[in-house]
Swiss-Prot record:
UniProt main location, coarse: nucleus
UniProt subcellular location: Nucleus
UniProt KW Aminoacyl-tRNA synthetase keyword: no
Disruption phenotype: Worms lacking both symn-2 and mec-8 die during late embryogenesis. Lethality is probably due to defects in alternative splicing regulation.
Similarity comment: Belongs to the ESRP family.
Pfam families: RRM_1
Protein name: RNA-binding protein sym-2
Biological role stated in the UniProt entry: mRNA splicing factor that regulates alternative splicing of many genes in embryo. Probably plays a role in the formation of embryo-specific isoforms.
Length: 618
């Protein structure tokens, strides 16, 4: 290396790791040597063999892999140094992660280095050196001195220390390494952000916006992240950090495909793309009142200033989900804003989380696809107007069948739609004591509800009065949606149950989809469902029932959608029923105008043989 230097103390360093165990006994092997100086023009040129190459000018020492010892080593020679390695591991996998884990500034000499692995091994036959000499650090140092500047520039590597958030486009170009640039990490703490992930993979080149935190079906972080690197070399080094620790949790790292990353990190929403394109610091707000406004959010964060963009998350029908994303211009403002976690807007406490562009895309995409799920596609088609052409039966004996319901309805059974009786089962596959019946029109449903409400049904020796309410197809769709989300197969008709061996019930925990199912308003004579957030571990079903039971309303059912833990509060859905007086008893037939009898010829069988259409609910 005939490099003319301006400082006599400038040095070259050849760094490698003593072994591949990376434990407390692993050391850095550092070989220090100095470049040759050009002779004066009046002197004869010096050949490489006659240049100063004695062993006294090439020294090797061991350095402990601790921040203190490494910093001390570089401070001994404060001038700039050229670092050479045989592969990226000493810099990218050992030294830079060492400083990142301890939240220390990376020394400037480590920001770039010369990787001579491919160049040096590729020239081993040309140089005429044996394998034993290649492994000798002194021999490698002498070979480096013989390389010219142009050859060395080809080996120059720059380490990108800072991670750059950015939106990922669907038409993003794929690099030369193709699909071998993505890994999946599991086991992240719930409070981990994209910057924690970047710290875990410090020293490796991550593409701008290449960290995509994954969300569960509820829209919450599930402890997984997909990371896209700029090269396969960085991805392979990332796999070596399998079972390393992040925030006291060990992380599992596996290979993943580029299509998996693109599915999570990209989206088709123009509004979301415009929001994340600002490259500001994103914070997610959860638990907002449904009528929350832009001004209330800005007041909530005062005296901090937000950017002009606030993204409210809504369902496809325009109803808000209680989530929003805001942006801060600086990291300092974002950290101050996160200190307002669990403060209130109105009567609701607000949860705050640092977010990413990929998380914004996932939440918006999930809300846009919620109404295209198989559960909704299979639901009973609801008309544009909310016609109450259904009736809901409550208090049925568990042994009740469709035939018992038809007998209970009496003359009103002739006004039931074909295959219009829907039994409701819980998530263990047992009858819930409820049923939905589709009538031919609203007048028939109203007359049926008024005519048989609080009448008695006899099943064997049991005799119970049945509550009958007029309902809409939307309520039926809601229960059908909840039932489809369970993974429990529908039970067989009761006629076959006697032939099956008894099975012990297998309770399953119910997890609702994100966003939460819609809430019906409280209407006298009907039921409503309330979603309760922030439930403490000490709160159970008895406490919820006691708190929400009033002279006007009674709690019919409590469904925990998330059990409270010491890390995360719980959520539950409460079913309330109005205790208002039932409608006055009137003549059912007087409320029906010009109802024609159904055409039994159109049925393939007798209308009383309604096939069982089970749906599941909690």
């Amino acid at each position: 290396m005939n490099r003319q230097t301006s400082h006599p103390e400038q040095r070259l360093l050849l760094i490698r790791v003593s072994d591949g165990n990376y434990d407390e006994n692993t050391k850095l092997v550092v070989t220090s040597f100095y470049p040759r100086r050009q002779e004066d023009a009046n002197n004869n040129s010096t050949s490489p063999s006659s240049a100063s190459s004695s062993g006294s000018e090439i020294s090797t020492r061991l350095v402990n892999i601790t921040p203190e010892d490494v910093v001390k080593f570089f401070d001994e020679h404060p001038t700039s140094s050229y670092i050479f390695t045989k592969g990226p591991e000493p810099i990218r996998h050992v030294l830079i992660p060492l400083f990142a884990r301890n939240e220390l500034c990376v020394p400037h000499p480590l920001h770039h280095y010369y990787d001579i692995k491919h160049l040096y091994y590729g020239n081993q036959e040309e140089d005429g050196m044996e394998q034993e000499e290649i492994e000798d650090d002194v021999a490698i140092a002498r070979a480096i001195l013989d390389m010219d500047d142009e050859l060395l520039e080809k080996t120059h590597q720059f380490v990108n220390i800072e991670y750059q958030p950015a939106p990922i486009l669907e038409d993003q170009e794929v690099g030369a390494d193709g699909d071998n640039v993505v890994c999946r990490a599991r086991g992240l703490p719930w409070q981990a952000s994209d910057h924690h992930v970047a710290q875990f993979f410090a020293g490796l080149d991550i593409v701008p916006g290449g960290i995509a935190l994954c969300l569960s079906s509820e829209g919450r972080r599930n402890g997984e992240v997909l990371v896209q690197f700029s090269s396969q070399e960085s991805r392979d080094l990332a796999l070596k950090r399998h079972r390393n620790f992040l925030l006291s949790r060990y992380i599992e790292v596996y290979k993943a495909g580029l299509d998996e990353f693109m599915h999570v990190a990209t989206g088709s929403s123009t509004e979301a793309m415009e929001f994340v394109s600002a490259n500001a610091i994103i914070v997610r707000m959860r638990g907002l009142p449904y009528d929350c406004t832009d001004a209330q959010i800005r007041t909530f964060f005062e005296p901090l200033k937000l950017t002009d963009k606030i993204l409210f998350i809504t369902r496809t029908d325009g109803r808000p989900t209680g989530d929003a994303f805001v942006q801060f211009e600086t990291e300092e403002d974002a950290q101050q804003g996160l200190l307002k976690h669990r403060q209130v807007i109105g009567q609701r406490y607000i949860e705050l989380f640092k977010s990413t562009a990929a998380e914004v895309q996932q939440v918006v995409k999930r809300c846009n696809l919620i109404n295209s799920s198989p559960a909704v596609a299979n639901a009973v088609e609801a008309p544009e107007e909310k016609k109450k052409d259904c009736v809901r039966l409550r208090g049925l004996p568990y042994e009740a069948t469709v035939q018992h319901i038809v007998t209970f309805l009496g003359d009103f059974a002739t006004m039931v739609k074909f295959q219009g009786v829907h039994m409701v089962y819980n998530n263990q596959g047992h009858p819930s004591g409820e049923a939905f019946i589709q009538m031919i029109n609203e007048q028939a449903a109203s007359a049926c509800a008024a005519g048989v409400h609080n009448n008695f049904m006899s099943v064997g020796k049991k005799k119970r009065y049945i509550e009958v309410f007029q309902a809409s197809a939307e309520e039926l769709n809601l229960h059908h949606l909840v039932g489809q989300q369970h993974q429990v197969p529908p039970p067989a008709p009761l006629g076959f149950m006697g032939q099956l061996p008894p099975q012990a019930p297998q309770p399953q925990q119910f997890w609702s989809s994100y966003p939460s199912p819609p809430i019906s308003p409280i209407v006298p004579g009907q039921v409503t469902q309330l979603i309760i957030y922030g439930i403490h571990m000490s709160i159970g079903v008895p406490e919820l029932v006691a708190n929400f039971t009033t002279p006007e309303h009674t709690v019919d059912n409590v469904l925990f959608t998330r059990w409270p833990t010491h890390l995360c509060p719980g959520e539950a859905i409460l079913t309330l029923r109005n205790r208002g007086a039932p409608p006055p008893q009137t003549s059912p037939l007087s409320q029906i105008s010009q109802l024609s009898a159904p055409n039994f010829a159109a049925y393939s069988h007798h209308p009383q043989n309604f096939p069982l259409q089970p749906i599941l609910m909690e």
